[in-house]
Amino acid sequence: MTVVVGVDGSRPSRTALRLAAQEARCRQVPLIAVSAYEPPLGKPAGGYPIGTLHTDDDERVTTESALRDAVSKELGDQANQADLRVSEGLAGHVIIETARQTHAQLIVLAASPGKPMLPGTVSQYVLHKAECPVMLVPSGSPAPQPADQPKGEALR
């Protein structure tokens, strides 16, 4: 059993990450922070690369670094308690597959930044495919407060 959170590095996803960490602590289950990357453009029939010359390894390293930085910044001393996972594929598919593999109790996602109260394409996909509850965090949500911390004090 786990809590799975999708992290894309955006401010709303960082808020979702903090909330997911709090949920994982309350439930006494591991936190899994997930990021996805799409493979770079392929080669046409002639064998010459089109588009970017980045490789899958470049994309993976960049995504892993961004996820590690986000978790470290948002969770501080508790960052080492999060299991970080980076996979190639569409974000919604990666989140659902991770949730299934880890028997997630909860999936936490940020709402689309442009529409704070509406789900984006990733969250719509996850909402329809998830086998567990999904918490959708509005993009304007304040950072969560731990249950044992008085209101007004910042979560560290």
Model-derived regions: residue spans:
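A short acidic, glycine-rich active-site loop
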Residues: 51-66
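Small/aliphatic-rich secondary-structure junction motif
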Residues: 1-53, 140, 155-156
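General small-molecule cofactor/ligand-binding pocket signal
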Residues: 32-34, 83-87, 135-137
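Glycine-rich, Arg-bearing micro-motifs that act as flexible, cationic patches
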Residues: 106-128, 139, 143-146
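Structural beta-alpha unit
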Residues: 12, 72-107, 142-156
